[in-house]
A protein has these predicted regions:
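N-terminal catalytic cores of NTP/NDP-binding nucleotidyl/phosphoryl-transfer enzymes
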Residues: 24-94, 100, 123-138, 244-245, ...
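Basic, alpha-helical terminal appendages of large translation-related enzymes
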Residues: 1-32, 259-262, 271-275, 355-372, ...
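Helix-rich, typically C-terminal accessory recognition domains appended to large enzymatic cores
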Residues: 79, 144-145, 149-156, 410-441, ...
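Flexible, glycine/threonine-enriched loop-and-boundary segments that flank and lead into catalytic domains
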Residues: 214-241, 288-317, 321, 419, ...
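Long, charged, mostly alpha-helical binding arms that flank functional sites
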Residues: 3, 224-229, 237, 362-365, ...
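Residue patterns forming the tRNA-binding/recognition surfaces of aminoacyl-tRNA synthetases
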Residues: 2, 11, 18-19, 91-248, ...
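NTP-handling and nucleic-acid-processing catalytic cores
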Residues: 3-13, 49, 135-362, 468, ...
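Conserved oxyanion/phosphate-binding beta-strand-loop segments in alpha/beta enzyme cores
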Residues: 1-36, 66-75, 99-106, 279-323, ...
């Protein structure tokens, strides 16, 4: 019978819809397993092939766990607030709510089309007022605990989205969402004090099973360092303070630099003789993003503050002060000391402005470049009492001296900044606060939540940078919940990251009207046992959700300090590059491609995009080859954690494998158990597939199944052999497996159970190695046949078995065996001569 994948997949998807085999049961006595993937943003384009990679992997893990006797929670939802939907709605003149529901409907269809074992009764949607009621409730708890505050500050402003971006949302000077340039603006913003949790966010990484690159990225982003704050005297009434991790280099300080935003500059306006020049520089710096002022800032610019003198506390010498935009007000004290002999950025600045360069750690040639050691073994020179010490010895010695002299003290510093939490857009959760002229900011009473996002006539962007909600005067104007006076609602909305910072908790108890999650459900399901997601979310969603979870732990909502016990990540799937030089034959054509597309022309695979025409739509793949083929290929494509390239030919190869499994059903004998001949390959494959799924080596698990099928075609197979194959293949290709399971009578054998409801096969270690082996027999180098002998038989046993062979006996008749060449378990060669 033909493998009609379309009919088979519809049949089983309809059945799963009816019987709900993926429903998780809170409080069940089975051990629990909570497997989580990052819920998708429901874009208008629908699923792309990047989605099925993590979704399929976690589905396989959860299916195996279910078969191993676990009560599995494998949920799905939609992270539906945010800029893309709003921008699409503005462009197409459709309300974002309508767009969102259309997109969710399409995503749901596609997810079910791929056969994912989600618990569809637990779906969450961040735009549902019954969901964001609790997002607002959590924000109010943050506000009540002084972890949410409003302040005027320089912020990242996307010139296209016309809204504020968090530092984490700016990538290489542009908006990570739309790619438009990001500039700096002064705006009043709601902030969350994530910095209060900086130490715990770093220290608690030791208690979780995250892949190392995730831990490293989070540690680097938080950027904790222990150093020294040093006070420098000036010729004004103000001292300045500098933070440094290399207090040992103080003798090498030849200048200082202040941030353009530092408040001291305004205070010194009457002292600075070239104020007009400084003010113009400040204005230019204000138009740049932090990235432009940092990583992109190759040319060192600045203005010397004429009239300001700074005294180096180590040497007593006067050094100049500059204002330069490479110093950011948000890190350290907003003032840095310049040690050009041992910092390349400082060296470049000193060269640009003709400043002295002093060597204080010997070993390099500071006339050519700064000398920067990667370790602390360098020897101090030109450093007074530190001379002759190693850097390792000099740092504590200088720190002790600075403390004793009263101009220094130890300080722990962080790169992490508080989270910019408000957005001047429409499509987000309303911030449930009211601004009263008498009472200040007052929370909306909890019993009035959710504060529902109102319908607006125009949700398009305002040129003045205010939220579209600001035009809704009937909604904005309200009464103060505290004193009853006239007041105004906050019109900014929450960022997209708000709803995703706690969604994993709502999955545990999605229909609870009284609290975000009950203690019963959270105690049972928490923490998430395995969370897989993209590396691009490591310093955004993953960090934010850990922060919110720790806060919820502090106020008694959850019982675990960390939300996720395990975190893994997956590689991106690339598309074929239509502009690759390998696609053309002549050098002239290759040169033309390089001239037009640069380095991109040298890469055979690139990120999929509509403009390149290399986007792969899962709908098309499923229509042509079936959902099981799509699932199988997306796992067979390569190392799960690394980038992989889509190949239509390789998809066809996975379809051929499933065809072979389908056709293999006709060759199954009535022998019920695992056959003796296939026992080694069956038990070895069970061991391999079990271990590989647990370690995300899905491609090698599939390769092992393919090898086993090859053996079955060579050896023949029993019902027991086929049963083992179907059970192992079930997580990868569930539709086809259930059809074969039913057709071959296994469902009847197990009282109507589907394959997915049966126990995962177990292996016997002793049977993973064959008890006998087939060996080739040669007589004087000529092949005479094969023999079956026990594994690791000695030479005498092998020779006797060979001599018992009819062909060998005939070949050595009348001959004398003068030598035996024995390759254990492989070959025996009898060297003979006439008697």
């Amino acid at each position: 019978m033909k493998y009609d994948f379309a009919a088979i997949e519809k049949k089983w998807q309809d059945k799963w819809e009816q019987v709900k085999p993926y429903a998780a049961v809170t409080g069940d006595k089975r051990p629990k397993f909570y497997g989580l993937i990052e819920f998708p943003y429901p874009s208008a384009a629908g699923l792309h092939v990047g989605h099925p990679r993590p979704f399929t992997a976690m589905d396989i893990i959860c299916r195996k766990k279910r078969m191993q006797g676990y009560n599995v929670l494998n949920p799905i939802g939609f992270d539906a607030f945010g800029l893309p939907t709003e921008n699409f709605a503005i462009k197409n003149h459709i309300h974002p709510a309508i767009v969102t529901q259309q997109n969710i409907k399409n995503f749901t269809r596609q997810l079910k089309m791929l056969g994912y074992g989600f618990d569809w009764d637990r779906v969450v949607d961040t735009t549902d007022p019954q969901y964001y009621k609790w997002t607002q409730w959590i924000f109010l708890q943050l506000f009540k605990h002084d972890l949410a505050y409003k302040t005027t500050m320089p912020v990242n402003w996307c010139t296209s989205c016309k809204c504020v971006l968090a530092n984490e949302e700016v990538v290489e000077g542009v908006c990570e969402r739309c790619g438009a340039p990001v500039i700096r603006k002064e705006k009043s913003q709601w902030m969350l004090r994530i910095t209060k949790y900086a130490d715990r966010l770093i220290d608690d990484l030791d208690d979780v099973d995250y892949i190392e690159r995730v831990k490293t990225q989070q540690r680097n982003w938080i950027g904790r360092s222990t150093g020294t704050e040093v006070t420098f005297k000036t010729n004004t009434e103000d001292d300045i303070t500098v933070y440094t991790t290399r207090v040992d280099t103080l003798f090498g300080v030849t200048y200082t630099v202040i941030s353009p935003e530092h408040p001291l500059l305004k205070k010194w306006k009457g002292i600075i003789k070239n104020w007009d020049e400084v003010e113009a520089y400040q204005a230019a710096a204000a138009r740049k993003s932090d990235f432009e002022r940092g990583e992109l800032n190759k040319d060192k610019t600045g203005v010397r503050l004429d009239g300001i003198e700074v005294i180096n506390p180590a040497t007593g010498k006067v050094v100049p002060m500059f204002v330069s935009d490479y110093v950011l007000m948000g890190y350290g004290t907003g003032i840095v000391m310049g040690v050009p002999g041992h910092d390349q950025r400082d060296w470049d600045f000193a060269k640009a402005f003709g400043l002295p360069i002093v060597e204080v750690v010997e070993g390099g040639d500071i006339t050519k470049e700064a000398f920067t050691l990667k370790d602390d073994t360098g020897i101090m020179v030109n450093s007074g009492f530190l001379n002759g010490m190693t850097v390792k010895e000099a740092i504590p010695a200088m720190k002790k001296y600075a403390v004793e002299q009263g101009w220094g003290h130890e300080k722990v510093n962080y790169k992490l900044r508080d989270w910019v939490f408000s957005r001047q857009r429409y499509w987000g959760e309303p911030i449930p606060l009211v601004n009263c002229p008498k009472c200040g900011w007052v929370p909306v009473p909890e019993e009035e939540l959710p504060l529902v996002l109102p319908q607006v006539d125009s949700y398009e962007l305002t040129d003045d940078g205010k939220s579209p909600l600001s035009k809704m005067t009937d909604w904005v104007n309200t009464k103060c919940p505290k004193c009853g006076c006239d007041a105004k609602r906050e019109t900014d909305t929450m960022p997209q990251w708000a709803g995703s910072s706690w969604y994993f908790l709502r999955y545990m108890d999605p229909h609870n009207d009284h609290e975000p999650v009950s203690h019963e459900a959270e105690n049972y399901w928490g923490p998430v046992d395995w969370y897989n997601g993209g590396m691009e979310h490591t310093t955004l969603h993953l960090l934010y959700s850990r922060f919110w979870h720790k806060f919820l732990y502090d106020i008694g909502v959850v019982h675990t300090k960390e939300p996720y016990a395990k975190r893994t990540s997956h590689g991106m799937i690339l598309g074929q590059n239509p502009h690759y030089v390998g696609n053309v034959s002549t050098q002239e054509e290759k040169d033309a491609l390089i001239a037009k597309y640069g380095n991109q022309a040298l890469r055979p695979a690139v990120k999929m995009s509509k403009s390149l025409g290399n986007v792969v739509n899962p709908d098309d793949v499923v229509k042509a080859y079936g959902a099981d083929t799509m699932r199988l290929y997306i796992m067979f494509i390569g190392d799960f954690e690394k980038v992989a390239t889509w190949s239509d030919d390789a998809v066809k190869g996975c379809k051929r494998f499933l065809d072979r499994v389908w056709n293999l059903a006709d060759q199954v004998t009535e022998e019920d158990g695992v056959s003796e001949k296939n026992a080694p390959i069956v038990h070895k494959t069970i061991k391999k597939v079990t271990d590989d799924i647990d370690t995300l080596k899905m491609n090698t698990a599939i390769a092992a199944l393919m090898a086993m099928v090859n053996e079955f075609y060579s050896n023949g197979l029993s019902r027991g052999d086929f049963e083992a194959l179907l059970l192992m293949l079930s997580p990868f290709a569930p539709h086809m497996v259930e059809e074969l399971w039913e057709q071959k009578g296994f469902a009847a054998k197990y009282e109507g159970k589907m394959a997915m409801q049966c126990a995962w096969p177990e292996y016997d270690e002793s049977k993973t190695v064959a008890s006998s082996v087939e060996m080739a027999v040669q007589v004087s180098g000529k092949f005479k046949g094969t023999i079956i002998v026990p594994v690791d038989s000695d030479q005498d046993t092998v020779v006797e078995a060979a001599k018992a062979s009819e062909k060998v006996a005939k070949a050595i008749a009348g001959m004398q065996i003068v030598k035996v060449i024995h390759v254990k378990n492989k070959l025996v060669n009898l060297i003979v001569k006439p008697c």
